[in-house]
Amino acid sequence: MTTGGPTPDRPRAGKQRLDAQLVAAGRVASRSRAADLIKRGLVTLDGRRLKASDRIDSRDFPRLVIDDHPWVSRAALKLVEGLRQCPDFSPRDQVCLDVGASTGGFSQVLLDAGARRVIALDVGHGQLHPRLSGDQRVLSLEGLNARDLDPTLLAREGVTRLVSDVSFISVTKALDPALRALAAGAQALILIKPQFEVGRDGLQKDGIARDPQAALDLVAAWLQDHHAGWRILWTGDSPIVGGDGNREFLMHLERT
């Protein structure tokens, strides 16, 4: 939670726009700073991401959280926790592939942890933060579906580490080419989102997975059937619940 900034004041009486209230209460230094934090999804109330136009009052402030951090995206915190839990994954001096890079939160964490080079792959265009797209250590592969990844690229680049945060597609589809291409000794640290693994029958009406643990079982079975050379070293909860409220998991793999 943010602790720096101007001397705290009191929120304005009655319901006011979120960005104005943050400044009035001294939680941020300016409306532009508030707008940036809100745009990046870092301001939440009872776990729900807020918009600048949302109206709050002083009674909401005890439940308001500002996850101000140095990363270009909130998702970076998921990989930060993964690296803490899996020190053997260390990306230091390694060439890493980031599947589903988006704005580059995972890529940024890898570079901060000493990665020599990061290949940031995403099916979208223009999403990678300038801090990453302007870094000579980053090779951006925009507009590329992970299922169409050229396996020879990984060999040419000498990729030994894989991270992934994909949405609207199962990891069993998105990561198949990369897992096949990586050589013995390679490691992967992937985010598993149950809502994209269990199928429609496994979801409640609100889109929450009925049995989140089932997603881990499905991925484990897929690995055993199609990627027997990969073994699971660790699984654990992501420190952040997905934006839609779904529980998420991290899985650490190694190719033998």
Predicted regions and their residues:
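A basic, amphipathic helix-loop patch mediating RNA/tRNA/ribosome contacts
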Residues: 2-61, 95
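Conserved S-adenosyl-L-methionine
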Residues: 111-117
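S-adenosyl-L-methionine
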Residues: 119-173
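A short glycine-rich, Lys/Arg-flanked "PGG" loop and its adjoining helix->strand segment in the class I
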Residues: 172-189
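Short, glycine-/aromatic-enriched active-site segment of Class I SAM-dependent methyltransferases
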Residues: 194-210
